[in-house]
């Protein structure tokens, strides 16, 4: 009986660390915000919604998965900034240049990033989950 329990424990621990498994990450880690900023810049390049650019406010959740490279999946609170689309190009957006617009629209987005650093490859897939009311805490 003891041998079976030891083997099951070993199998469970081994399976948790296998390639391809989804791992929850610390959403507050600075590396995630950097990746999210790059994704939101792409979101702004492909969108004409509103007069101002969107900026990330908070990484709500972060997950990773080892595939042919790394796949990162984020839920991100995004909000309207004070940076006008006509005055600031999407690739020039930064937290130093753009701050939150008072009363601006907020939304929750899913940002997926597939990276293969050895090939200098990064591909973003971005989708809006829902709008977020100003009074709603996330």
Regions found by a protein language model. Give the residues of each.
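N- and C-terminal low-complexity/disordered segments
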Residues: 2-138
């Amino acid at each position: 009986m003891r041998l079976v329990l030891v083997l099951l424990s070993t199998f469970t621990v081994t399976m948790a660390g296998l390639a391809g498994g989804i791992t929850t990450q610390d959403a507050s880690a600075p590396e995630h915000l950097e990746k999210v900023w790059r994704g939101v810049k792409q979101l702004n390049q492909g969108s004409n919604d509103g007069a101002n650019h969107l900026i990330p406010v908070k990484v709500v959740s972060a997950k990773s998965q080892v595939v042919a490279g790394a796949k990162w999946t984020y839920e991100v609170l995004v909000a309207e900034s004070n940076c006008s689309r006509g005055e600031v190009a999407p690739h020039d957006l930064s937290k130093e240049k753009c701050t939150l617009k008072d009363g601006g629209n907020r939304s929750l987005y899913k940002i997926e990033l597939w990276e293969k650093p050895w090939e200098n490859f990064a591909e973003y897939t971005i989708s809006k989950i829902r709008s977020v009311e100003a009074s709603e805490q996330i």
